[in-house]
Amino acid sequence: DGLRMRFFGLGAEVMQKFGVQTSLLPGGEIFAALEKGAIDATEYSLPVVDQRLGFHQLVKHNYFPGWHQQATTFELLINKDVWNGLTDQQRMILEVITKASVADSFAHGEALEGAEIKRNATEYGVTNHYWSDAMLAEYKAAWLEVVEEQKADPFFAKVWADFSEFDEEYKYWSSIGYLPRPEAPK
């Protein structure tokens, strides 16, 4: 009888290790599920998107950072036969406009989030919480358990090995290229 929460993917498996009952609901069904009491909490998107969906009307606690998804990956899926039927110029146009769209989305998204979480707090009574280092460490430990379980799948094991190799290389850059994590906001 744990917390009932909308969560997706492997992050849901992490949450289950903490006794959370997870379910994957499409975005359009989350508000109604919260309103009816079918779920107690949700993970969905960035604060700007969550606010547009009205979540602030029903849930009054936001937790940051999103440990399970530090970035959003955008994609455009095109049928291979359709792609192969395009001219080089059409392919180039699609590549340029999708890259521009992603850059624009990242820039605007980051620019809007701070004001939105402040507005949620001041106008709608939402409390913003910052995960402690201890809690983030617990999530990481549970995540690594999920990884070990998932590595039984050969494809997952291959992807994880590739990711881990990249991560090891990136750790050096991130250790010297960025400021340390700031203190939690007051």
Cite the ranges covered by each PLM segment.
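N-terminal secretory/targeting leader peptides
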Residues: D1-K186
